[in-house]
Swiss-Prot record:
GO cellular component, one term: ribonucleoprotein complex
Enzyme Commission number(s) from the entry: 3.6.5.4
Primary residence: cytoplasm
Summary of the function given for this chain in its UniProt record: Involved in targeting and insertion of nascent membrane proteins into the cytoplasmic membrane. Binds to the hydrophobic signal sequence of the ribosome-nascent chain (RNC) as it emerges from the ribosomes. The SRP-RNC complex is then targeted to the cytoplasmic membrane where it interacts with the SRP receptor FtsY. Interaction with FtsY leads to the transfer of the RNC complex to the Sec translocase for insertion into the membrane, the hydrolysis of GTP by both Ffh and FtsY, and the dissociation of the SRP-FtsY complex into the individual components.
The protein's name: Signal recognition particle protein
Primary enzyme class: hydrolase
HAMAP family linked: SRP54
Gene expressing this chain: ffh
Family, similarity comment: Belongs to the GTP-binding SRP family. SRP54 subfamily.
Organism: Escherichia coli (strain K12)
Amino acid sequence: MFDNLTDRLSRTLRNISGRGRLTEDNVKDTLREVRMALLEADVALPVVREFINRVKEKAVGHEVNKSLTPGQEFVKIVRNELVAAMGEENQTLNLAAQPPAVVLMAGLQGAGKTTSVGKLGKFLREKHKKKVLVVSADVYRPAAIKQLETLAEQVGVDFFPSDVGQKPVDIVNAALKEAKLKFYDVLLVDTAGRLHVDEAMMDEIKQVHASINPVETLFVVDAMTGQDAANTAKAFNEALPLTGVVLTKVDGDARGGAALSIRHITGKPIKFLGVGEKTEALEPFHPDRIASRILGMGDVLSLIEDIESKVDRAQAEKLASKLKKGDGFDLNDFLEQLRQMKNMGGMASLMGKLPGMGQIPDNVKSQMDDKVLVRMEAIINSMTMKERAKPEIIKGSRKRRIAAGCGMQVQDVNRLLKQFDDMQRMMKKMKKGGMAKMMRSMKGMMPPGFPGR
């Protein structure tokens, strides 16, 4: 997420953060680099101009905090201004209205509206314990109604049936009546996608909006469209009273222009980020955390939240108990750890939330592919239960059979066993309580180029 911008800004700010004093010249040079990085990230020009002016105003002649060097103070100013550009703090959904709270989703075709409705339904059901009903008012695309029905079943929320022969206003009114009758907390309304902002379609969504009077009107927009996302959101906002934005496909956006432009151009907050195809891949938008990620400082708070919500506690306690008894760490445990990592969004997602990732060379980053986890899982699945429990018995002929069973090479099996040995040693150190030793050994296990290596 935002890799190109993170690389450029991390490199630029690393050059200035070691400076003993800031002069107008080196601030000017650094700001020129920052400006280029933002423009290359497709941030809207008015946003870039205001951002640079605000940083310059605060940096030149700024009194430095005694605990920071002038260079560090400059980085702090840049981070604070990034946060300000994106909206200061997380804006949650307004669900305080008398139930059912109606949330209307609008946006262009292909932005990911229907998927976002499913993700939001899951988020509200699991995180906020809400009883959710979803309905599709997209009568122009029969597949959209079926898609939402399938998604609703997957995420465990209720679906209100609709038909292409009905009028969108009639559909949403019937759904609202049902939601009131059956005491639903939230009604999520999926609307037809527009190819562009045309008058007939905008009139239709205005009528839908007027008939159900939603407490939240969210504009769903594809992050990969860059500053166009902000301009489209502005056009929609002129027709509809938007309350926020859902930025989708953020995991595929290496630039980040949309995230930095939307708040400034529309005046509306980004409320959620779509960070993948899975139904749980929806994150509340925290400007301070995203600013830290953009500057390569990581996002430890989100990482902790991921661990708390996505790691299977029963399995974690089972492993801890096993290690305490001295039963050892085997390949079944290793397989479980790989699955937990996949549940948390995969290797790239985890690494993106760790501090210092902006300093990693591109050739090392390219190896952080989630396909690696899939291959490792396939190799372990090709082993017998005896081999998983006693990895030391895996020698030449067994390695050849395992490799053939999963379509890999023997060197792939060797690589996995080496990684398992490293993990096993680390677990032994944890058992002995040598946390400091373990941290040092983790640094040793990292490829050259990682922070701290």
